[in-house]
Amino acid sequence: MKQVILILILLASIRAIAQEHLYDRIFFANSPMENSYYYSEVSYSGNSWLKNMSKRLPVNDSVYFTPGNSLEIDYVSSPNGQWQVKLFYRPVRGQDFFSKATHMFMRLFVSSQTDTKQLPAIAIGSKKDENHHFITLHQHISDYKRGKWLTVKVPLRIFQIKDINDVDVILFRQQSNDGKEHIMLIDQVEFLAEEHAPVRSKPILTSAKGYERHIDITWQPIEDSAVKYIKIYRSSDGKNFHPVGIQSTGIARYTDYTDTVQKKYYYKISLLDKNYHEPAASNVVSASTRTMSDEELLDMVQEAHFRYYWEGAEKNSGLALENVHGRRNMIATGASGFGILALITGAERKFITRESLTARFEKIMSFLEKADKFHGAFPHFLNGTTGKVEPFFGPRDNGADLVETSFLAQGMLAAKQYFNKANKREKYIVDRIDRIWKNIEWDWFRKDDSSKFLYWHWSPDQQWVINHKLIGWNETLITYFLAISSPEHGIPASFYYSGWASQSKEAEKYRSGWGQTKDGSLYTNGNIYYGVPLKVGVSNGGPLFFVHYSFLGLDPRKFTDAYCNYFSNNRNIALINYRYC
């Protein structure tokens, strides 16, 4: 029986990998910050030297292979010295599955009078290891020329690495000792396969919209797996175009910051394959920047946040992904509750039609009805294709997450109120929401009848193994509020003070543990921070999401307990945070 279960688990894992988008392992494409690249480390000794900014590589934003920047390695290799650069892999949450790679590729631009033997040596490996197998760089460059972008292609097997997935650093070090200054730029440092499929799609731009200092352009979504990037070109005269950025295939829009008001710009895009070849360009669209009022600025910000949930949703379910540029099939249930609220706002603000919202909710409810639930509660993460639980945080996280469920329920209850039209479609949505809401067994998460707390997690095979009690001040107020309000599975109202706002020794220890202070450990605080009084909150109030998550549905102006009014308390936490920053 155990063998059968193991086989089923392995098959499920294989299916998950097959369904998920495969990323390339990229060590450098662009630096999001100007001046220096955070994920690098520079060192030198003796008479050798390496240009750096606070021991990091400088960023060059004027010469690049793909827009908008590259990394500059400006060095002097002396006989009595040594220099070294470490380029670290930047892990991205949810980028867990990678395409099979056979080579390390890098684009190289040599701007100095440098011979091939004066180029550095290179190695790959783990940050934990001290010894690495270096090879000479020049042996893997064909048709070496200065002043143009060259392709460096090194078979990964040469580096003598047992498991390529363990590689998290690329190293460059001094190879010669001529004592002269040399300058080279590097870009698109990545692990790829040697052979790639050609791009067969044609890009089609659909819109351009101007704001005060930027322009948003959109295109038809790209489904062609051979496409690596969308490359964006801008022109100020409609004739002479130059590249301004690249975009990943999971996003069908780009924001171009021009920093110029009252000017017209033209745009076109092309699709890059993994060899960076560009087939035909798209059609051209144009828009002008314009002066905006404060009201228009706020509308712009709100619509942009709405688009994250509208355009960035998981395709099958219509719900929120855990993060964009992460797993493309993994839904975060709590974030989906926030997304539902954003969708309602979008319809109310006429960003979309009520008909479009209704259609999206029909998709959402069809998915949620069939998705995994445990005593009516949803897991933290769901597979958007199958509706099955995704134990993203480990094997113990394979069941219900009551807090994430409360965030989702908060959104659904708002939708239940919003869909108030006397038609069959909206009434059916309301009925479906009502069934899911009433079936959440909040009282089950007491663990036993003697408990004065709710518990965060429950696992179908390990039960209460995580054993995390819900104790405020944090983001879990809405969980207690909904549990007390439940029409079918309610808990006593006394749990608000015995659980959420508990002043027991256990609760005091919990708060002082994560807060690393006694301030606020009894739920109440009473101190003044940066001139602002704080009635409730651990330390100086904690992260701002504590005042966000529970009050997206609850109106803090109307929420007062024995200790404070939560609009005033939340405002003071925001002021403390502002003054701290």
What does each model-found stretch correspond to?
Residues Y229-Q262, K274, A280-A281:
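Recognizes extended acidic, P/S/T-rich segments that occur
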Residues Q19-K55:
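Extracellular carbohydrate-recognition regions
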Residues Y75-I161, G179-L185, E190-E195:
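Extracellular ligand-binding interfaces
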Residues L171-K180:
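Short beta-strand-plus-loop segments that form exposed binding edges in beta-rich domains
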Residues E195-A226, V261, K274-M292:
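Pro/Thr/Ser/Gly-rich low-complexity, intrinsically disordered linker/stalk tracts
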Residues L57-V85:
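Short carbohydrate-recognition loop motifs
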Residues E212, Q262, K274-Y276, V285-C581:
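Ser/Thr/Asn(+Pro)-rich, low-complexity disordered segments
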